[in-house]
Amino acid sequence: MIREMTPEDRNEIDEMQFELQKFFFELDQTRESLSYQSIDDAHYYMQKMIDDTKSMDGKVFVAEKNNVVVGFIQGVIIEHKKGEDKIYDLSHNPSKEGWIGLLYVKPDYRGSGIGQELLGKMKDYFTVQGCTSIKLLVLSDNANAIGFYKKIGFIAHNLEMVMKV
């Protein structure tokens, strides 16, 4: 079952976010240390993310199996209006975009369609809100995630290059 996150889901969401952060650290060669070191740090980060999500007309949905939260997705809406950003105006039309910030499914539940269900729910929300596209960022070394996103219709659009100094 996919539903909107409730305050009762916080501990499970915090634990999943902490696992996700450790995974990112393993893949991201530009990070010298974990962004946060404990579940308390994850809790702080998730509270900020939830507050930001609310202020940006976003949502957090969870996937639940047998009364256990096994995955979540977070997304926000970004509206680009003509004249707000001169550089953006040079290369884009005014638009309303859905942005996926986080998507996580517990390892034991991957490959069972939960990620697709979560994305489908967020896509439905973005569509109702009038978004014309959905965007997300994925680490270039995260082959599984890239394959997943391509399989459901995402295409590679921009490539961000980073150099440590």
What are these model-predicted stretches?
Residues 116, 120, 128, 140-158:
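Conserved active-site alpha-helix within GNAT-family acetyltransferase domains
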